[in-house]
UniProtKB/Swiss-Prot annotation:
Its EC number is 4.2.1.19. GO terms for cellular component: cytoplasm. This is Imidazoleglycerol-phosphate dehydratase. It holds the Pfam family IGPD. It comes from Bacillus cytotoxicus (strain DSM 22905 / CIP 110041 / 391-98 / NVH 391-98). InterPro entries: IGPD_sf, ImidazoleglycerolP_deHydtase, ImidazoleglycerP_deHydtase_CS, Ribosomal_Su5_D2-typ_SF. Its main location: cytoplasm. NCBIfam families: PRK00951.1-2, PRK00951.2-1, PRK00951.2-4. CDD domains: IGPD. GO terms for biological process: L-histidine biosynthetic process. Keywords: Amino-acid biosynthesis, Cytoplasm, Histidine biosynthesis, Lyase. GO terms for molecular function: imidazoleglycerol-phosphate dehydratase activity. Pathway: Amino-acid biosynthesis; L-histidine biosynthesis; L-histidine from 5-phospho-alpha-D-ribose 1-diphosphate: step 6/9.
Length: 195
């Protein structure tokens, strides 16, 4: 069974259409109106081997905050929907990813509990139309909407672009590991028998 989810979200601030395919990696198309964010989401999908299509229009005359946060909410909602059946799933995933001088780390638990730990210094406040503080807001929105525990950490680096890129790639790789099925896991990967 293919694990897919689609969702539309319309508010007075944003209009978002998102389609996620966990087990298909061919189709990646991201258009949010925030160039750097599009680049990061494309890297996330490519390195996670996910199909991901996003069309978003936001109130960019204000700033990119609502667009970035709402895309995170919709992506998290789609993840929660597509991961309802957790039988045979690894549940946990972690990845270190270098990007030149920067090193990013992400660990994920598909636990049914929403939690974010974010650590990292982003010295450059803006990359194009993207306020770099929105990196944490995006991960918080995804974690809370998806009901996952997510730890994202920039261990070191100098270039802000490289630091954020390492995190998004690590997020894709860690999520891929967590959602993959494992034939050695019988039922749900929890002593409780449910998540």
């Amino acid at each position: 069974m293919m694990r897919r989810a689609s969702q539309e979200r319309r508010t007075t601030e944003t209009k978002i259409k998102l389609h996620l395919q966990l087990d298909e990696s061919e189709n990646i198309s991201i258009r949010t109106g925030v160039g750097f964010f599009d680049h990061m989401l494309t890297l996330f999908a490519k390195h996670g081997r996910f199909g991901l299509q996003i069309e978003a229009v936001g109130d960019m005359f204000v700033d990119a905050h609502h667009t970035v946060e709402d895309v995170g909410i919709v992506l998290g909602n789609c993840l929660r929907e597509v991961l309802q059946n957790k039988e045979g799933m690894n549940r946990y995933g972690a990845a270190y990813v270098p990007m030149d001088e920067a090193l990013g780390f992400v660990a994920i638990d598909i636990s049914g509990r929403s939690y974010l730990v974010f650590q990292g210094e982003l010295v450059n406040p803006k990359l194009g139309d993207f306020d770099t503080e929105l990196t944490e807001e995006f991960f918080r929105a995804v974690a809370h909407a998806a009901h996952i525990t997510l730890h994202a950490r920039i261990l070191y680096g100098n270039n802000t672009h490289h630091k954020i890129e390492a995190l998004f790639k690590a997020f894709g790789r860690a999520l891929r590991e967590a959602v993959d099925k494992n034939e050695k896991i019988v039922g749900i990967n929890s002593t409780k028998g449910m998540l």
